[in-house]
Amino acid sequence: YYVIAYINCSAHVKALSDCICTSGNAVKIVEFAPKDRPILFVPDQNLGSWVMERTGRKMDLWQGSCYVHVEYTRESILKIREEHPDAELISHPECTYAVRMLSDEVCSTEKMIDYARNSNSNDLIIATENGMLHRLKKEVPEKNFIPAPTQNCACSECHFMKMNTLEKLRDCLDNLDPQIEM
């Protein structure tokens, strides 16, 4: 296999992979992957499925997913769209196929900013980790960003992403610690 790993996976998985991708460059990475080798895409099956839809390239997908993005459901999205009929829905490719099919745009977090900036709609429903809403509001303040609800609440926050702080980054650079051995 030619193993392509999503950037959000562990350092150990990255070390065993041939190539690392982001949601923003995954399509290009797959397009340039060796044609004579089968691809194993890890660890997010929804992102991998979206990449296959975009590229037409068959891949074997690891059966993993982001616990935040799979909480968005067809039902929760239909409900919020009913409440905001003029709003556009932007979702991250880690969302399930059912949510992606209901979306006006499926794109990486970086591309969400450009899409929001250029959208004719003033109201945008965002189906990704809630931390992105702060950035969108800061970069495109003239738009109204509505958090997409999960089945149970609108609290789609990733505690893993919140573990990284500026202080921890500073300390890591100052002390070269913690060190990870593989």
Language-model regions: role of each:
Residues 1-182:
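The feature marks the mature, well-folded catalytic cores of soluble enzymes
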